[in-house]
Amino acid sequence: MYIIESARQRPPKRKYLSSGRKSVFQKLYDLYIEECEKEPEVKKLRRNVNLLEKLVMQETLSCLVVNLYPGNEGYSLMLRGKNGSDSETIRLPYEEGELLEYLDAEELPPILVDLLEKSQVNIFHCGCVIAEIRDYRQSSNMKSPGYQSRHILLRPTMQTLICDVHSITSDNHKWTQEDKLLLESQLILATAEPLCLDPSIAVTCTANRLLYNKQKMNTRPMKRCFKRYSRSSLNRQQDLSHCPPPPQLRLLDFLQKRKERKAGQHYDLKISKAGNCVDMWKRSPCNLAIPSEVDVEKYAKVEKSIKSDDSQPTVWPAHDVKDDYVFECEASTQYQKTKLTILQSLGDPLYYGKIQPCKADEESDSQMSPSHSSTDDHSNWFIIGSKTDAERVVNQYQELVQNEAKCPVKMSHSSSGSASLSQVSPGKETEQTETVSVQSSVLGKGVKHRPPPIKLPSSSGNSSSGNYFSPQQTSSFLKSPTPPPSSKPPTIPRKSSVDLNQVSMLSPAALSPASSSQRHES
């Protein structure tokens, strides 16, 4: 910043050759030095700005006038004749913005070279053209509109120089290739800006600052943003707003309209103080007639009691009967072991079931008496029903375990009590090991006899009335890391009929096959 400020305050003076007149660049530099030497009227302002406007006012240079009109009126070009009158061209729409792009880049448009050469007044200054931009778009008075004016210097490009070479060599004189190259080199030397080869760092800093100030608003993102709000873009949006949206943009159009509709709504919500408002809900009369009578049977729900299977007579056991079925398999290099326990308590004709993961150290627990070997919670037990239902539960659970594990399943059966399930329904055969534990009344200890392995057939469950287990339930039992908490098994006193409310307190009705059969009957 210090170097740039010093260059602004004390610019070096240049030495010009005595022969020839000054170019437009030399005039601008002399004007810059002159303005730097003057004291500004306000200390915070600088005088060495708007040099091109000051040069045009001092020497009354001829300019190319570009008029920018508001709305859809477009823009036009205007040239001054010898008599001082201005001749304006036709107005072009803003959609034809090729000429405006050249003006924005401060380059001489090639399409205007022939037109400017044929003008009555010499408008070229060392190959450059001074353009005056008159912007009528910011004027508020439409009857006598004013304009904002600024000047830009349109410099020649290689394309315009080639056009000049072609126009000069298009006469009847024969031009060789060397003559054309020599003419092109002379045109470049005549129109090029003065070259500064000063090794001072101030030159680099000043050039970078000038380039930054010129290009800071001409970046690609800024141009894209300006083009979005240009007149041509607004006209295109206005035309497309009257057309029906394409099928791909119906949702976007609906959201845009809803957003505009919500933005136009204004709600004047005022919160009154406590005590100043009237609760109209409380003041509204409540005309509710009390019914003279209520049809209870219409709204009452009768729940039937549990009915056991009539195919087999009801057997009241004299002792607790407990059957343990242990399923073992190795699925995906992981050992899995689950246990299905079926229990019939003393004085209760119904069978109850429970499924839990089984660990290796629970084999010793199976040798204990039924009163000590199970201390599970009542919520873990579910009602099965009759003996036929219990056999069906065993078969279905065995199939589900085998389908889940996708490998051979080994089932071992241990029974305690006076009676047990006789056999499993016929079906596919699975290797099973049966272990029977018989209690001795004399010794008071359970003596376990292990007979040789036998093959027990198992049913596929197709003949059963319903499935008691789902594959999701089986996988949850197989993947459970620890067994659930345990307490004493449920017992129901001897009665001729079992009340449904008492049974629901002991086990969940959703897991009960008896409750499922009840739903089928209802």
From Swiss-Prot:
Q: Which domain of life is it from?
A: Eukaryota
Per the record, where are the segments of Pro residues compositional bias?
A: 481-492
Modified sites of kind Phosphothreonine? 482
Cellular component, GO annotation = SAGA complex
Instruction: Mark the residues carrying the PTM Phosphoserine.
Output: 284, 507, 512
Region Disordered, residue ranges: 361-380, 408-522
| One Pfam family hit | Spt20_SEP
Please note every region of biased composition (Low complexity).
412-425, 458-467, 506-522
Compositional bias, Polar residues, is annotated for: 433-442
GO-annotated molecular function: transcription coregulator activity
Query: Keywords, A to Z?
Result: Developmental protein, Gastrulation, Phosphoprotein
GO BP annotations of the record are: gastrulation; regulation of transcription by RNA polymerase II
Q: What does this protein do?
A: Required for MAP kinase p38 (MAPK11, MAPK12, MAPK13 and/or MAPK14) activation during gastrulation. Required for down-regulation of E-cadherin during gastrulation by regulating E-cadherin protein level downstream from NCK-interacting kinase (NIK) and independently of the regulation of transcription by FGF signaling and Snail. Required for starvation-induced ATG9A trafficking during autophagy.
Q: Which family does it belong to?
A: Belongs to the SPT20 family.
Q: How does it assemble?
A: Interacts with ATG9A. Interacts with MAPK14.
What name does UniProt use for this protein?
Answer: Transcription factor SPT20 homolog
Q: What organism does the record attribute this protein to?
A: Pongo abelii (Sumatran orangutan)
